[in-house]
Amino acid sequence: MGKEFQIKIDSLDLGQVLDGLRARQQSWKNTAIFLRDDYFPDDSFVCEQCSDPDEAEKIASHYERIIRSVEQQIDQQGGW
């Protein structure tokens, strides 16, 4: 694990950060589905630069861990 940071950010901005992280996570999940099943998950799907479905799934999982960590910290500070 790398160095930990404490960042102060407005709740609206934090919501935008989480939305962006969720979009990236979904994109990588969709890439894993496409690479594994040769199936387009939705009409706006754009495949990430990856050729290994396991790697794409690991990247999606990494985004999920980041999102979960941020959400836990929000909860620890009293929620939205």
What are these model-derived regions, one by one?
Residues 1-80:
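Positively charged, low-complexity terminal tracts
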